[in-house]
Amino acid sequence: MKSAKKLLSVLCLGIFILTFTACDMVEKTPEAKAKSTIAKVNGEKIQRKDLDESPSMQQVLSQIKTQYGEEFEKSEQGKEVIKEQKKQILENLITEKVLLQKGKELKVIPKDEELNKEADKKVNEIKAVYNNDEKKFEETLKSTGFTKETLKEYLKDQIVIEKVINEVTKDVKVEDKDAQKYYNENQSMFTEKPNTMNVSHILVKTEDEAKKVKKRLDAKEDFAKVAKEVSQDTGSKDKGGLLGDISYSDSNFDPTFMKAAIALKSGAISNPVHTQFGYHIIKINSKKEYPVKKFDSVKEDIKKQLKQEKQQEAYTKKIEEWKKASKIKTYEKNLL
């Protein structure tokens, strides 16, 4: 099972007209279901087997079996969960189909010899994950529904998709001034050690409630006592609102909350801060802040990060444009 999950994880890194006839009243055979059309992209079919045999779907099924047991997918709830997952994966397959079609249009598909060579290289990279143990590799392929041939075809498609993405993003550039601006605006991200703050908060529903809480705290009432009394954050209420030590770069907290907390000095209490969860009164119990690294020492890392972000933006914009211009039809009734 672990080997199968490992292969699926490696593969998933790559990417990533209802007609009612008498035939619809007849139960389809497994073979017929596998060949049923679940989408058409500019006239090209995506069959159910393309989805069911995809690494993404295999990974979903593996996770469901591990978490809920073998019988879950047969239940009504299980079928609904799987159908929703299939819808998401189908959207990815549609995107891939558009990209493969654009590969032909943009003439970025390598000649067969080169494509085979690149695919073989990727196969060898996957084998290396299994320490080049051929038997273990073949057993894992079998358990994930792949053969050597279908794996290679899948990898060929991923190579073409990668080349299309590279073509779309090839003109993306980041200047030193862009990196300097980002550095100046985010210096807390470039300290010699991660800056941390010990934080407490009180969460209430409305701004009026938050103002009343702030008034009590301004009158020198004990923060922990007030938090235990009125805070609606069940995770920290009984601890007097204590959230503990938080890194300045912690992405588990609301960005507005983090921005307000970072701006406070040690010992300070904020005015009401509005986030998706309600209104917070934030207290900084203590801070540990470290010197900022010199710009030149982090410049290339910043440029690399910004370039990746710009490439993602360019790719997302282009694929949305291509999909909008494509003739796409889905057949959700054939997903299950």
From Swiss-Prot:
Lipid anchor positions (N-palmitoyl cysteine): 23
Keywords, alphabetical: Cell membrane, Isomerase, Lipoprotein, Membrane, Palmitate, Rotamase, Signal
Subcellular location, principal: membrane
Domain PpiC as annotated: residue spans: 194-286
Single GO BP term: protein folding
GO CC terms, sorted: plasma membrane
GO molecular function: peptidyl-prolyl cis-trans isomerase activity
Record Pfam families: Rotamase_2 (PF13145), SurA_N_3 (PF13624)
Entry's EC annotation: 5.2.1.8
Record membrane topology: Lipid-anchor
UniProt xrefs under SUPFAM superfamilies: FKBP-like (SSF54534), Triger factor/SurA peptide-binding domain-like (SSF109998)
Subcellular location: Cell membrane
Catalyzed chemical reaction(s): [protein]-peptidylproline (omega=180) = [protein]-peptidylproline (omega=0)
Lipid group attachment sites (S-diacylglycerol cysteine): 23
PANTHER family referenced in this protein's UniProt entry, alphabetically: FOLDASE PROTEIN PRSA, PEPTIDYLPROLYL ISOMERASE
The family this protein is said to belong to: Belongs to the PrsA family.
HAMAP family the UniProt entry points to: Foldase_PrsA
Function: Plays a major role in protein secretion by helping the post-translocational extracellular folding of several secreted proteins.
Protein name listed in UniProt: Foldase protein PrsA
Taxonomic source organism: Clostridium botulinum (strain Okra / Type B1)
